[in-house]
Regions:
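Short, low-complexity disordered leader/linker segments with a strong preference
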Residues: 1-36, 60, 65, 108, ...
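Hinge/cleft segment of the Venus flytrap/periplasmic-binding protein
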Residues: 22, 168-173, 280-329
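Extracytoplasmic "Venus flytrap"
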Residues: 35-54, 58, 67-80, 84, ...
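Short, solvent-exposed amphipathic alpha-helices that sit
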Residues: 47-62, 144-151, 176-195, 214, ...
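Short beta-strand elements in bilobed, periplasmic/extracellular small-molecule ligand-binding domains
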Residues: 59-71, 165-168, 189-208
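Hydrophobic alpha-helical segments within soluble ligand-binding/sensing domains
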Residues: 78, 135-164, 211-212, 260-264, ...
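Hydrophobic alpha-helical
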Residues: 95-115, 185, 200-265
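Flexible loop/hinge segments that line or gate small-molecule binding clefts
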Residues: 101, 105-143, 165, 261-269, ...
Length: 329
């Protein structure tokens, strides 16, 4: 009986504190709180789909409703999604920004809702410290590119190749995550004292099939390709398939990706790609839902200390993949 009274008093207090915002919505038929969370992602792709799946699983475990929408890389659309969820009395939102400068606008549209940014950190970190119920969970995108660049640099130095010819495959030309990774990779290569020639720079749309088709057409003229730098695993695999289709020897062309998705790990094992970097989708997906439930329970993060939860990228090669992912076998 005491536990029941404690349960009722706890949710009564939440309802009073939330007031007209109706953060907790009660189902009068079973007396069970129904919490609605909105999740807006910049675009769809293998990694973000895995993040969404992790978030959905965590939401189901917490018995809350999660609505997931893609903004199709349109920041205006994403801002409107957040505003609608605020108007519809959603409890909180999870956001993968289209534009890393849009954090302030998202918070303005979110109103009093807790906001968890994931995957792409707002460029202005002060945004994360402007409210107690705002945090970021994810990696530093530049680290992913830096690790790619360092891997390629070490390879070319070992081959005494100071002027490598590199193909670069971006996600989309105007995508911040893609651009940050590429810039960091190029900087790492330059810092190693190499003078690369970027023979091919094109968008693969985060997609394996598009990358394979577009890159294969380029390869018809048989250009020299010393390496491929792709900003995700799907495009790295697409590039590898295009090279093989065009008659290139993959064993002499290092191909690097990002995310270490199950497909990417399989490609590392079978030799199609040589390097990827791992970011755990559960840290971002389930992690965001769990943080929201904690905040809705009244435990707010310290804005100065807990507003950013960095998760480091891990390099993945044929040498360490079985140690990092023993359950794949």
């Amino acid at each position: 009986m005491r536990k029941f009274l404690k349960f009722i008093l706890s949710f009564t207090l939440i309802a009073i504190l939330c007031g007209c915002q109706r953060t907790v919505i009660f189902d009068i038929y079973n007396n069970h709180p129904k919490i609605k969370i909105g999740m807006s992602i910049s675009s769809e792709g293998t990694f973000l789909n895995n993040v969404c799946a992790s978030a959905k699983k965590a939401a189901d475990e917490h018995d809350v409703q999660l609505e997931i929408l893609s903004a199709n890389n349109d920041q205006k659309t994403q801002s409107e999604q957040i505003k609608k969820w605020a108007d519809d009395n959603y409890a909180a939102v999870i956001v993968v920004l289209c534009d890393d400068t849009a954090g302030k606008q998202i918070l303005e549209n979110a109103g009093t809702m807790p906001v968890v940014f994931i995957n792409l950190c707002p460029s202005d970190h002060e945004v994360l410290q402007s409210k107690q119920n705002v945090i970021y969970i994810g990696g530093k995108e530049g680290d992913a590119g830096r690790l790619q660049g360092e891997f390629l640099s070490e390879y070319f130095i070992s081959q005494n190749n100071n002027t490598p010819t590199i193909a670069v495959i971006s996600g989309e030309s105007d995508n911040f995550t893609s651009n940050i990774r590429i810039d960091a990779a190029k900087e790492a290569i330059s810092n190693a004292g190499l003078m690369p020639f970027y023979v091919y720079e094109s968008s693969g749309g985060w997609d394996k099939s598009k990358t394979q088709s577009d890159f294969y057409k380029f390869l018809q003229s048989k250009p020299t390709i010393d390496a491929v730098l792709a900003v995700n695993d799907d495009m790295a695999i697409g590039a590898a398939d295009a090279l093989a289709q065009a008659g290139y020897a993959l064993s002499s062309i290092p191909i690097v990706g990002v995310d270490a998705t199950p497909e990417g790990r399989a490609a590392v094992r079978d030799g199609r790609i040589d390097f990827t970097v791992y970011q755990n989708p559960e840290y971002q997906g389930a992690g965001a839902v769990n943080e929201i439930m904690t905040m809705l329970g009244g435990d707010m993060p310290n804005a100065d200390v807990d507003s950013i939860q960095w998760h480091e990228y891990m390099p993945v090669t044929a040498a360490n993949i079985d140690q990092l992912f023993p359950d794949d076998r």
